[in-house]
Regions:
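Basic nucleic-acid-binding interfaces
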Residues: 1-171
Length: 171
């Protein structure tokens, strides 16, 4: 084959550091635009950026010429600095992302569901904690959790977890 064909959709999640201030609702839409702009600068196509006061979901295509971790670090770093420069209520130094992030592959056939899931973050988090959301996504994408959870903890979590209380199956 003479040409490389590449299209990898990624559902990424950034969460604020435990000592960080929450994302100000007054800055939220501008902040999402800034995050989108930074992904585009990295050669990514962005489908949606949306989140909640403590985390942000991004659905984008990965640039085949860059490692994912470089894209994520760049966007986290620049967007963190942008937020710090625009948050006049709490002080510039009080907003910080966690260094860790989540990144899941999304097939073209699952794009509509992933987009819907991200678009409806406000509704989802009325009934679901961030950590339950992450655990569900990890299970859905078969992420190995054995280092962080015992089998008993996972069985307990699986028995109580259900998306039925959200009103629609999102993923």
């Amino acid at each position: 084959m003479r040409t490389t064909f590449f299209k990898l959709w990624v559902h990424a999640i950034f969460h604020i550091n435990e000592n960080s201030v929450l994302i100000d609702p007054d800055l939220e839409s501008l902040f999402y635009l800034e995050i989108e702009k930074r992904f585009i600068e990295q050669g990514c196509e962005v489908a949606i950026v949306k989140g909640n006061l403590d985390h942000v979901h991004i659905l984008f295509t990965q640039n085949p010429l860059l490692p994912l971790h470089e894209t994520m670090r760049f966007v986290q770093g620049i967007s963190q600095r942008w937020y710090q420069m625009h948050d006049f209520k709490t002080g510039w130094y009080k907003f910080k992302w966690q260094e860790a992030y989540c990144a899941y592959s999304v097939s073209e056939s699952a794009m509509e569901k992933a987009h819907f899931f991200i678009e409806n973050q406000g509704e989802i988090h009325q009934n679901l904690s961030y950590w339950d959301e992450i655990e569900h996504l990890n299970l859905l994408h078969n992420v190995d959790l054995t280092d962080e959870h015992s089998d008993v903890e996972m069985q307990s979590w699986q028995s109580r977890f259900s998306f039925k209380h959200i009103g629609k199956e999102f993923l």
